[in-house]
Amino acid sequence: MSEQPIRAVLWDFGGVILSSPFEAFNRYEASRGLPADLIRTVNATNPDSNAWALLERSDISPAEFDALFASESEALGHRVPGADVLALLSGDVRPQMVRALDTVIANGFLTACLTNNVVSTSEPENERQVQVRDIMARFHHVVESSKVGCRKPEPRFYEIACELLA
């Protein structure tokens, strides 16, 4: 089998272009005397059908997520409102990664951002949202779980990205 040249680079957004929400989760947990990584544990329990998965696919609203996540966390011994978790999702832009993205594009590679996300409910657009929108506009394609109805690590999510880049 002959090797094919690399034509495209797939990027994640949270934890790559933005700082990881896991850092904010840990600060929240510590400030409330909760076990470390509780939020991640809730998110990892029934990962294809839990509140987090449902929200990322836009199968439930943020209000429904609030109640369902609270119930799921309570089942693990500590009630955490889902609204609190949503407030922790906005990471900081990593300028060095934005420069890396610009370099990849300048070198002729196609790019796609693959992100598990939720529909934004904040109005009006704030400064951070403008910054994120401007970064997203750099990508040739953006695949958002909240818009395509599937999420990482589901194979269909990656298939959509490959179809867009073909």
Residue ranges and their predicted role:
Residues 32, 95-144:
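Substrate-recognition/cap helix-loop segment adjacent to the acidic, metal-dependent catalytic center
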Residues 14, 148-149:
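Adenine-nucleotide cofactor-binding loop residues
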Residues 3, 136, 164-166:
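Alpha-helix termination/capping residues and helix-transition junctions
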Residues 72, 145-146:
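Alpha-helix C-capping/helix-to-loop hinge sites
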Residues 23-26, 126-130, 157-159:
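Short, glycine/charged-enriched secondary-structure capping and boundary segments
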Residues 151-166:
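Conserved Lys-Pro-Asp/Glu-containing loop-to-beta segment of HAD-superfamily phosphomonoesterases
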Residues 3-99, 106-107, 118-122:
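N-terminal helical cap/lid subdomain that shapes the substrate entry/recognition surface
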